[in-house]
From Swiss-Prot:
Annotated residues for binding of [4Fe-4S] cluster 3: 57, 60, 65, 99
Domain 4Fe-4S ferredoxin-type stretches: 3-32, 48-79, 80-109
Record's protein name: Arsenate respiratory reductase iron-sulfur subunit ArrB
Subunit structure, interactors included: Heterodimer composed of one large subunit (ArrA) and one small subunit (ArrB).
Amino acid sequence: MRLGMVIDLQKCVGCGGCSLACKTENNTNDGIHWSHHIATTEGTFPDVKYTYIPTLCNHCDDAPCVKVCPTGAMHKDKRGLTLQNNDECIGCKKCMNACPYGVISFNAATPHRRWQDDSEVVANGTVSPLMLLKRTGATATPNENPERGDTYPMIRPKRTTEKCTFCDHRLDKGLNPACVDACPSEARVIGDLDDPQSKVSQLIKLHKPMQLKPEAGTGPRVFYIRSFGVKTAY
């Protein structure tokens, strides 16, 4: 099995719902985005073209982050996903430097530490972040998802790296990654690239797919088909 993803740019509306769903599902800290995007604006008024390409870990066949990791923290699982054993991460950032896509993040500070602030924004008028955290019964952030902790630390610790896992904890339960289910236009499909009958394989066969930075030779498993269709003319 080789899990991969197809993103149909013609269906994508650039809403960012995938990124919001990812942050909610995976408890990522401020400024850390497992699901992100490349947005470009071309042309001059009144003929302007806007393009939006969602990005995430490509779970490459020949993942450079796995090759350079000195402890084996970055590794491949039986589905071909590029995963990380956070307990073995020493924070050396070699994986970050090796990744040609810039999709690996580093926790330079303790994640979600703003929720440990016990000062009220408005004295006697609002609760403090810490008070709100305690009222929800959460440990790190009020909207934390404990299910993320099934296969990976629920909150990744300071001085470790982290990245998209294709929501492996959801895959284990037969569910799609959060970004796939959240997409309002169903632009994302995940499936087995080794199965010629899978939807991802059929889409790749039907359309001429694109991969990000193919010249890097990493064998990315995220494929893009068709083109983002927003063009504004006044």
